[in-house]
Amino acid sequence: MSPPESVRHISVLGREAVDWLAPRDGGVYVDATFGAGGYSRAILTIDGTRVIGIDRDRTAIAGGFDLVEQSDGRLTLVESRFSQLAEVCASQGVGQVDGVVMDVGVSSMQLDQAERGFSFRFDGPLDMRMGHDGFSAAEVIAAASEADLANIFYIFGEERHSRAVARAIVAARAETPIVTTKALADLVSKVVHSKPGEIHPATRSFQGLRIFVNAELDELHLALTAAERVLKPGGRLVVVSFHSLEDRIVKNFFAERGKASSGSRHRPEMAQQQPSFAILTKRPVTPSDEETAANPRARSAKLRAGERTAAPAQPEAPLPHWPTLASVMGRR
């Protein structure tokens, strides 16, 4: 059964994303963040296209079954992380594809479901997992050290008051477990103050915790390099991101792949690498005034796109050294 219209995820920059993807008859495309299927639905309007939809959220996969039935076998849905898109394609007998589109971050559907624990706007269990495995946000809040919590809020949430927030959490959890979104939001609001018209005091802390719980930035790094490997020459990669951390990763990825490398004595395998992407969007595409008026969550969205060249995929760079679930929860 499809989710009701009230909880359907609106594909931000949906028309622009599909325009830059430029699907064509007979092409095979990966919708790496299926959500409510907005991109997939648009791609399937082109006769002869095939879509592999990926989402780590089994609720989204279940919600797409109607579209699968309507697609006459042209849509396949797979529950997986988008960092695994190359393996997913291989499992479907697909070696290379004509395009990959991804909408990075939490979906409106997830934000609007109180039981998922993503939003401070609704009281619910402090969960925040996009999938259904791994540590929940409540478990991280209960177990992480004060220093680790401060790093999580500062690095992933860009919260200037991260140390004060972490200190308040450690003091509060010694008295009562913090297991609901309201409890955490109320606690953060006592430490971080905002003026009328500014974002909610808990916005950055919730963002940082969510990104950490889902390893979102690592996933994005891996998904971009996976897309590079599976795209045919002439295939397109289109990425919509929603905050500066994500956009910086996407921008740097295209910048590195969009120019020839002269090599590095630190990474000899990079010698004489030719550009693996031609950058299509010299500047990010942003939503129109009409779209942001209809969907305020779109206001921070940025779209970047590139076209795969015939050059070999560039070697995968090491992931940045930032807090991970394995390192933080392993220190309990």
Curated annotation (Swiss-Prot):
Record key words, sorted: Cytoplasm, Methyltransferase, rRNA processing, S-adenosyl-L-methionine, Transferase
Official protein name in the record: Ribosomal RNA small subunit methyltransferase H
Gene, per the UniProt record: rsmH
Pfam families, per database record: Methyltransf_5
Disordered, as annotated region: 281-332
GO molecular function term, any single one: rRNA (cytosine-N4-)-methyltransferase activity
Subcellular location(s) of the protein: Cytoplasm
Primary role: Specifically methylates the N4 position of cytidine in position 1402 (C1402) of 16S rRNA.
InterPro entries: RsmH (IPR002903), SAM-dep_MeTrfase_MraW_recog (IPR023397), SAM-dependent_MTases_sf (IPR029063)
Catalytic activity: cytidine(1402) in 16S rRNA + S-adenosyl-L-methionine = N(4)-methylcytidine(1402) in 16S rRNA + S-adenosyl-L-homocysteine + H(+)
An annotated GO cellular component: cytoplasm
Family: Belongs to the methyltransferase superfamily. RsmH family.
Organism: Rhodopseudomonas palustris (strain BisA53)
HAMAP family: 16SrRNA_methyltr_H
Residues bound to S-adenosyl-L-methionine: 37-39, 55, 82, 103, 110
